[in-house]
């Protein structure tokens, strides 16, 4: 049976005429078409002029054989006439069939949809206005993608709108802003929404920018890439520069910089501050739509190379992110504002003359009333000026979305060995010479002595080399240590009050639940001791410090946050990973030693109480009772409350101590429960026993004088700490408070309720370097 007419099926036979196939449509050339049209015109003309059948063309002659058929044939052959007077056909035009539809401009997303976030409201045009306007001049709404607007919280919607209005110049004659929200409020998500909106739409129905550069610490480059993938569901790819050879890096950056197309495959460049500084020459050649600087407080010094390199970028849209408000130095404040909006405060000399000198004179103890009034006037003027481009919200907003957070400052007593080493060092000739060498500021010797005391407060192992070498201040100290003391062997927690307390608390946490713990220290040597303790107790752990590569850091964090992971401890160096890490797999955090800068400690302690946390959080800050660590804590509190100009650019606060300050640092009372509480001169306590609770409107962001004060383990919000106080016998005093309004039972075994009373959302202007604490009757200064 033949299936087709193909030659292989016909068997070589010729097709019969009845099987010949002629396609219905033949491609004719222009000349053939014109001949057909001419023949048709002649045929119709013959029909009109014919008077009898014999005059008709031959094909019609056989059908029109009667007068009736003749009449019908003439009607069909009648020429069409356009029913318009004096119509002249346009035979030479290029008109197409039908009417060309008018393009109507519409926003990319529906501005009337539920939860729609409209960043720009277009004019409400009438139909007559639309008809009379050029299509290219019609403006449309700018609406955030519903993929993002449906998950943004109220304060985040406000933040996205604020940043959009700033970078688009709708709030004034500037195009930069500072997002100064505290840690955990979703600054990254707000920036993702802003970047995605600017890359996809504008009021003119085209992208506002074609590419964006996001600069961050090296440890956060991968985190930014994950955030874009997470929130945009893979709709956009980023170019993340992390590692790689120099040749590949140069090639990738040149390709990114030179490409000006709006259809760029990777429109967002994620790069670290260090890498940007190295390859700034490539990135500064071409225009960039916008730059975002994460952890922007790194740019507080306008003289460093990174600041100068970023200022060379050819872009007017600049966004700076920083979770720590600039309170300590007006020069830092100027540097940050000048980076995002170079013309707002004038030059550095103008700022110093118009604002800084007046404000600093008003803060002097011997200032006149006129100078103080002038300082207040200038401060208000400066606040009003920079408020246009700075937005700041506190983490009190999170109380509506996160579990309760309990923060505790624990004063741990020094062990007898620590106590003897500490007092011997303070009485030594070394300290006396350090004080004698100080005139206006601390000498290098005094700074080294301060570091020695800080390490001794953590564990004698940290100064074992000084003891073995019998350095100045530690002569004959070898006799104080136990006979079997071996610093290179297994750690002995009993030699340190803080380590002893930590050991008891970790054991209780491990035994009574599945909570995970973050251990933070400023010294990698202390992390080594944490490791020894974890191995001794057989705790699973991971460690992140400055020696870990960027790629490995994200894997370590993901492993720890995995609920199925056996990692119990996360050991973190505050210098290497104190910013930006999300460690929500843990709900307990120990800040083992304080830093001179309160912002560093706050950044580090914000790692667990963040979006995604499901458990109540416990933050423990350990300080050695009466020691130099309490002095550091007092200065932290003093800076936060007074907002005074203490810390200079890129310098530690300890370099600015006067001789009197050093005398206070090197003072020590071994019998005191808490030097901090004594200096508060708390009116709510009688003989270190709290008689009156703190005001109802206070929380853990309030001054320490407004916290709960405990000289015994009654009334503590944490059963673990209450039990460890009894077992370890090394706790002398505790300050504690919670993150939100919540009743705390004052019983020995306190059960905490995680139901929190939501507080109203607060928008707070950035703190300025002038404040007054006279309204706080309990605050007596330090």
UniProtKB/Swiss-Prot annotation:
One of its GO terms (cellular component) is nucleus. Residues 773-782 have a biased composition (Acidic residues). GO terms for biological process: cell division; chromatin remodeling; DNA synthesis involved in double-strand break repair via homologous recombination; double-strand break repair via homologous recombination; double-strand break repair via synthesis-dependent strand annealing; meiotic DNA repair synthesis; reciprocal meiotic recombination; response to ionizing radiation. Residues 501-658 form the Helicase C-terminal domain. It comes from the Eukaryota. Belongs to the SNF2/RAD54 helicase family. Interacts (via N-terminus) with spn-A/Rad51. This is DNA repair and recombination protein RAD54-like. It comes from Drosophila pseudoobscura pseudoobscura.
């Amino acid at each position: 049976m033949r299936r087709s007419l193909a030659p292989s099926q016909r068997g070589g036979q010729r097709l019969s005429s009845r099987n010949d196939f002629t396609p219905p449509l033949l491609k004719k050339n222009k000349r053939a078409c014109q001949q057909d049209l001419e023949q048709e015109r002649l045929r119709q003309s013959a029909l009109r002029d014919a008077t009898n059948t014999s005059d008709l063309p031959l094909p019609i002659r056989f059908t029109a054989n009667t007068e009736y058929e003749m009449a019908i044939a003439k009607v069909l052959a009648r020429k069409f006439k356009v029913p318009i007077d004096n119509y002249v056909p346009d035979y030479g035009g290029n008109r197409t069939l039908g009417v060309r539809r008018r393009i109507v401009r519409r926003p990319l997303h529906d501005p009337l949809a539920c939860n729609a976030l409209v960043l720009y409201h277009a004019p409400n045009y009438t139909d007559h206005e639309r008809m009379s306007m050029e299509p290219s001049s019609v403006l449309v709404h700018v609406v955030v993608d519903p993929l993002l607007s449906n998950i943004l919280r109220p304060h985040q919607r406000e933040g996205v709108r604020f940043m959009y209005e700033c970078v688009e110049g709708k709030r004034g004659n500037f195009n930069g802003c500072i997002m100064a929200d505290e840690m955990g409020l979703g600054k990254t998500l707000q920036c993702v929404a802003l970047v995605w909106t600017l890359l996809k739409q504008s009021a003119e129905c085209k992208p506002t920018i074609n590419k964006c550069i996001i600069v961050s610490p090296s440890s956060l480059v991968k985190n930014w890439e994950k955030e874009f993938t997470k929130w945009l569901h893979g709709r956009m790819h980023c170019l993340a520069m992390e590692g790689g050879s120099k040749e590949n890096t140069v090639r990738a950056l040149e390709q990114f910089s030179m490409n000006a197309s709006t259809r760029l495959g990777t429109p967002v460049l994620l790069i670290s501050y260090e890498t940007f500084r190295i390859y700034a020459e490539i990135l500064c050649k071409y225009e960039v739509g916008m730059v975002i600087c994460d952890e922007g407080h790194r740019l507080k010094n306008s003289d460093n190379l990174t600041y100068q390199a970023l200022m060379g970028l050819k872009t007017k849209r600049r966004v700076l992110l920083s979770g720590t408000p600039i309170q300590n130095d007006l020069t830092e404040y100027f540097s940050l504002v000048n980076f995002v909006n170079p013309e707002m405060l004038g030059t550095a000399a103008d700022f110093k003359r118009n604002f800084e000198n007046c404000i600093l004179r008003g803060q002097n103890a011997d200032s006149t009333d006129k100078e103080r009034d002038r300082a207040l006037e200038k401060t208000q003027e400066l606040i009003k000026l920079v408020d246009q481009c700075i937005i700041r919200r506190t983490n009190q907003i999170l109380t509506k979305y996160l579990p309760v957070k309990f923060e505790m400052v624990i004063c741990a007593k020094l062990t007898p060995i620590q106590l003897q080493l500490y007092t011997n060092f303070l009485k030594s000739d070394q300290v006396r010479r350090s004080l004698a060498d100080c005139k206006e500021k601390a000498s290098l010797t005094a700074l080294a002595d301060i570091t020695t005391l800080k390490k001794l407060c953590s564990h004698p192992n940290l100064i074992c080399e000084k003891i073995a070498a019998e350095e100045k201040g530690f002569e004959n100290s070898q006799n104080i240590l136990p006979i079997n003391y071996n610093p290179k062997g297994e750690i002995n927690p009993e030699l340190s009050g803080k380590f002893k307390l930590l050991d008891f608390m970790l054991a209780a946490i491990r035994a009574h639940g599945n909570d995970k713990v973050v251990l933070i220290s400023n010294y990698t040597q202390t992390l080594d001791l944490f490791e020894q303790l974890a191995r001794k107790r057989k705790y699973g752990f991971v460690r992140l410090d400055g020696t870990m590569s960027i790629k490995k850091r994200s894997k370590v964090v993901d492993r720890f946050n995995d609920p199925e992971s056996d990692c119990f401890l996360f050991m973190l160096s505050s210098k290497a990973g104190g910013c930006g890490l999300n460690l929500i797999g843990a709900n307990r955090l120990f800040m083992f030693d304080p830093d001179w800068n309160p912002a560093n400690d706050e950044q580090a302690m914000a790692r667990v109480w963040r979006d995604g946390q499901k458990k109540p959080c416990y933050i423990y800050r350990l300080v050695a009772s009466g020691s130099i660590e309490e002095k550091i804590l007092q200065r932290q509190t003093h800076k936060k409350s007074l907002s005074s100009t203490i810390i200079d650019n890129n310098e530690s606060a300890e370099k600015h101590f006067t001789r009197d300050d050093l005398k206070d640092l090197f003072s020590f009372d071994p019998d005191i429960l808490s030097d901090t509480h004594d200096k508060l001169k708390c009116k709510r306590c009688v003989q270190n026993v709290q008689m009156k609770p703190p005001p109802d409107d206070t929380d853990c962001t309030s001054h320490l004088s407004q916290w709960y004060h405990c000289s015994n383990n009654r009334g503590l919000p944490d059963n673990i700490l209450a039990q460890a106080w009894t077992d370890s016998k090394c706790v002398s005093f505790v300050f504690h408070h919670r993150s939100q309004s919540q009743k705390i039972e004052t019983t020995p075994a306190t059960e905490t309720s995680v139901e929190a009373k939501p507080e109203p959302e607060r928008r707070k202007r950035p703190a300025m370097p002038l404040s007054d604490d006279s309204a706080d009757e309990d605050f007596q200064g330090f």
